[in-house]
Amino acid sequence: QPQGRVAKAVLISAVPPLMVKTEQNPGGTPIEVFDGFRKALAANRAQFYLDVASGPFYGFNRDGAEISQGTIQNWWRQGMIGSAKAHYEGIKAFSETDQTEDLKSITLPVLVMQGDDDQVVPYKNAAILQDKLLPNSQLKIYPGFPHGMHTSHADTINADLLAFIRA
């Protein structure tokens, strides 16, 4: 049943319910990782965006990866366009905001998509939990796909998105 004007939703490599490790979320990522992101961002934002895109975001740090300089440069370009302050504060927002109750309240159909080689958002603490919390979800885990799978594997992701929307 649509909620207002929204009939369906999709989560792609999404962070909910909670990324940071807490007493209630023992499988989360230690706060020191996010502190490191903030430190790197504050020290040299341009290098931070090159390093993340060149490494874990698209899986370019994996043996045999086909590295796309265009993809790296485009991600860097997008990062540099945004506000440094917003990016810095965004790290807290995406890592420390508990969205458990929000997920439970979404009753419309939700497609949850994530790669099992996501080095940025571990799928077992994200997609698997999202699927359990969302009352009307469909889970798709993609073997070997990275966090940035919407770019690195666009044909597969787009086909599954369209199939979900049309169903």
What are these regions (language model features)?
Residues 1-43:
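Flexible "cap/lid" loop of the alpha/beta hydrolase fold
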Residues 20-29, 39-104:
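Conserved alpha/beta-hydrolase catalytic His-Asp/Glu region
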Residues 116-119, 144-146:
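Acidic beta-to-alpha connecting loop that harbors the catalytic carboxylate
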